[in-house]
């Protein structure tokens, strides 16, 4: 008799707590259903544009460095060396383009980064070894001409981060 | 080219590609894993993550390319072929 009235309010409070929990659950469900994913998608699209712009900057810088190197080589060395350097530089830009494309597809249409870009140096070395008009060392140095543009891009990014 | 030089060149070419691809392979795998996790957590930072991944992949894969070039030179333009 004495215990029952003491327990009764506790039961009432637990029921109230349960009702509050139910109402909270309903409200959270309603917020989930009304969740607006628009800003996240817009930010993701803007971020993809940023990646495309980064690619374009790197390609422009690589082409500029390649043109400068080919011009200097043509001035100081034979035309055969300059042509080999030009072919190597174009192969390097193609390699970088394929790498950028496979990284762009990572997580969306493929689960891993493809290795198709490694065909480019293989074909370059094979072509240089088979064709007597081309030389191996200038072609390989030309292939590596995309690296200065990458280093320049990293330096630019680190400087902009430090300033911001 | 005598047979010993040919055999040594072939073995060296295999070792150059095989050993040279181990480190970059592991590094690229872990980098890609981190990038995909980062994109899944922060889709708004996708461009920056992909840009950083592109730069790091270009530098990592160059190690594989060095091994590949050494192997191809040994196989097709061997300087030790008398």
Swiss-Prot record, chain B:
It is found in: Cellular thylakoid membrane. It is a multi-pass membrane protein. Its main location: membrane. GO terms for cellular component: plasma membrane-derived thylakoid membrane; proton-transporting ATP synthase complex; proton-transporting two-sector ATPase complex, proton-transporting domain. The chain crosses the membrane at residues 7-27, 57-77. GO terms for molecular function: lipid binding; proton-transporting ATP synthase activity, rotational mechanism. The record marks 61 as: Reversibly protonated during proton transport. Keywords: ATP synthesis, CF(0), Hydrogen ion transport, Ion transport, Lipid-binding, Membrane, Thylakoid, Transmembrane, Transmembrane helix, Transport. Disulfide bonds: none annotated. Coiled coil: none annotated. Pfam families: ATP-synt_C. F-type ATPases have 2 components, F(1) - the catalytic core - and F(0) - the membrane proton channel. F(1) has five subunits: alpha(3), beta(3), gamma(1), delta(1), epsilon(1). F(0) has four main subunits: a(1), b(1), b'(1) and c(10-14). The alpha and beta chains form an alternating ring which encloses part of the gamma chain. F(1) is attached to F(0) by a central stalk formed by the gamma and epsilon chains, while a peripheral stalk is formed by the delta, b and b' chains. Belongs to the ATPase C chain family. F(1)F(0) ATP synthase produces ATP from ADP in the presence of a proton or sodium gradient. F-type ATPases consist of two structural domains, F(1) containing the extramembraneous catalytic core and F(0) containing the membrane proton channel, linked together by a central stalk and a peripheral stalk. During catalysis, ATP synthesis in the catalytic domain of F(1) is coupled via a rotary mechanism of the central stalk subunits to proton translocation. Key component of the F(0) channel; it plays a direct role in translocation across the membrane. A homomeric c-ring of between 10-14 subunits forms the central stalk rotor element with the F(1) delta and epsilon subunits. HAMAP family: ATP_synth_c_bact. This is ATP synthase subunit c. It comes from Prochlorococcus marinus (strain MIT 9211).
């Amino acid at each position: 008799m004495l215990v029952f009235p003491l327990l009764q309010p506790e039961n009432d409070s637990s029921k109230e707590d349960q009702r509050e929990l139910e109402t909270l659950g309903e409200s959270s469900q309603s917020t989930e259903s009304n969740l607006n994913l628009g800003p996240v998608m817009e930010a993701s699209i803007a971020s993809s544009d940023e990646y495309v712009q980064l690619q374009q900057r790197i390609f422009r810088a690589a082409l500029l460095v390649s043109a400068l190197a080919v011009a200097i080589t043509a001035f100081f060395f034979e035309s055969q060396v300059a042509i080999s350097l030009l072919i190597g530089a174009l192969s390097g830009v193609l390699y970088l383009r394929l790498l950028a494309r496979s990284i762009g597809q990572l997580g969306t249409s493929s689960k891993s980064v493809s290795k198709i870009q490694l065909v480019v140096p293989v074909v370059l070395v094979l072509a240089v070894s088979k064709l007597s008009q081309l030389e191996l060392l200038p072609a390989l140095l030309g292939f590596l001409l995309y690296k200065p543009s990458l280093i320049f891009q990293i330096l630019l990014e680190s400087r902009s981060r430090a300033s911001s | 080219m005598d047979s010993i030089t040919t055999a040594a060149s072939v073995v060296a070419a295999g070792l150059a590609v095989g050993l040279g691809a181990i480190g970059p392979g592991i590094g690229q795998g872990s980098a890609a894993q981190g990038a995909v996790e980062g994109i899944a957590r922060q889709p708004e930072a996708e461009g920056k993550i992909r840009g950083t991944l592109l730069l790091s992949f270009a530098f990592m894969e160059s190690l594989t390319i060095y091994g590949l070039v050494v192997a191809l030179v040994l196989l097709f333009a061997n300087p030790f072929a008398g």
